[in-house]
Amino acid sequence: MRDIKTYLSVAPVLSTLWFGALAGLLIEINRLFPDALSFPFFSF
């Protein structure tokens, strides 16, 4: 039971940090490459 409580208290913190970092990364990519439907370094 103690392990379950530890997991339930750690998982929301880790997911909040992960989604916050992911949102920040997406915001910075959209700031550097505005309205980019296809990135120039991925098109061959």
Curated annotation (Swiss-Prot):
**A cellular component term (GO) from this record?**
chloroplast thylakoid membrane
One Pfam family linked to the record? PSI_PsaJ
User: Where would you find this protein in the cell?
Assistant: Plastid, Chloroplast thylakoid membrane
Task: Give the residue spans that cross the bilayer.
Answer: 7-27
Keyword terms, alphabetized: Chloroplast, Membrane, Photosynthesis, Photosystem I, Plastid, Thylakoid, Transmembrane, Transmembrane helix
Membrane protein topology class: Single-pass membrane protein
InterPro entries attached here? PSI_PsaJ, PSI_PsaJ_sf
Cysteines joined through disulfide linkages: none
Q: Which domain of life is it from?
A: Eukaryota
Coiled-coil stretches: none
Q: Which SUPFAM superfamilies match?
A: Subunit IX of photosystem I reaction centre, PsaJ
For the biological process aspect of GO, one term held by this record is: photosynthesis
Q: What does this protein do?
A: May help in the organization of the PsaE and PsaF subunits.
Q: Which family does it belong to?
A: Belongs to the PsaJ family.
Tell me the protein's name. Photosystem I reaction center subunit IX
Species for this entry: Oryza sativa subsp. indica
